[in-house]
Amino acid sequence: EGNAAGLGLLPLVTQFEKNKTVQHCETQFATDLSGVWTALSDVQISGYEIHQGQTTQHPAMAKAGDVAVCALPNALGWQNNKGNVLGIYLHGLFEDEAALKALFGISTPILDSVFDGLADYIDHHFEPQFLNKLIKN
């Protein structure tokens, strides 16, 4: 419980709490994202919600006109008003096919398939004895 200084990229404050939230989550980005994150507007994504506290607008910064935009429901994501910073509590954004397609315009391989391909390559090109020797040294 308590607080600590963040990076200062978003006008937010987080009150840390005793219990940590870790759960699979499916959600949808807001329809009005701006800047480099516009492509994610209205995109449905899934990932793991991981955080230990509640994040809200920083009162003093909000009074001064520096307000973060809610990017995901339930305070899971925020964007600064310039549109160049996006902070989210949803881990796995760059493993979500819909997010990758929205951001890069193409379907890209997800991390699991990359590791599967690497494992297949190693299995095909290396003898088990050689790999065991590497591991033991």
Residue map of PLM features:
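Generic hydrophobic alpha-helical scaffold/packing signal
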Residues: 11, 24-26, 47, 51, ...
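Short conserved micro-motifs at the rims of enzyme active sites and ligand-binding pockets
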Residues: 19-21, 59-61, 97-102
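Acyltransferase
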Residues: 75-137
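Short, functionally important structural connectors and interaction interfaces within domains
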Residues: 2, 70, 85-86
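Catalytic beta-strand/loop cores that center a nucleophilic Ser/Cys/Thr
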Residues: 34-82
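Conserved beta-strand scaffold positions in the cores of enzyme catalytic domains, especially
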Residues: 9, 45-49, 85-89
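Short, glycine-/Ser/Thr-/acidic-enriched flexible segments
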Residues: 14-15, 32-34, 51-57, 85, ...
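Cysteine-nucleophile active-site neighborhood
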Residues: 1-46
